[in-house]
């Protein structure tokens, strides 16, 4: 997970600390060897970052992410280096957080979106009115 944390810090200026998720034993035994789950902390927010040991398809990533949200009660961020633009757009439409190191981080639970694929990074912070519209 160092790649993700380095990306968030060096490119976007987000100082996030992380360690292995202490409740890892809640993950189904057949899935445990194939997934790395870190508990991350940023400001006062705590969330999970998940990464698969193989290149999983988007439906599998979303299914596993949803089960981790249910198990942990925390926002869970998908980390996948090979997400195509259309896949990232689909995740954004469904408000599923993700990190695509070197390209984009979408963290809606922090009311922020970050892109680093362009020379000047873009940070979008939602105001309460926009947030209410997104909830509909």
Residue ranges and their predicted role:
Residues 122-136:
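Alpha-helical interaction elements
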Residues 1-96:
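DNA-contacting interfaces and partner/effector-binding or oligomerization modules
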Residues 95-107:
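Charged, structured surface patches that assemble and position nucleic-acid processing machinery
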Residues 107-113:
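Short, charged, surface-exposed secondary-structure boundary motifs
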Residues 116-119:
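N-terminal intrinsically disordered, cationic/polar leader segments
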């Amino acid at each position: 997970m160092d790649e993700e944390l380095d990306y968030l810090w060096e490119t976007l200026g987000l100082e996030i600390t992380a360690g292995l998720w202490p409740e890892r034993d809640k993950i189904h035994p057949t899935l445990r060897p194939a997934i790395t789950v870190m508990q991350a902390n940023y400001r006062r927010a705590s969330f999970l970052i998940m990464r698969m040991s193989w290149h999983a398809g988007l439906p599998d990533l979303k299914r596993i992410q949803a089960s981790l949200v249910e198990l942990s009660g925390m926002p869970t961020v998908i980390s996948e280096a090979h997400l195509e633009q259309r896949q990232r757009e689909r995740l954004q439409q469904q408000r599923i957080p993700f990190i695509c190191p070197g390209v984009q981080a979408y963290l809606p639970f922090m009311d922020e979106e970050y892109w680093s694929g362009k020379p000047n990074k873009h940070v979008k912070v939602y105001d309460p009115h926009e947030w209410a519209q997104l909830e509909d």
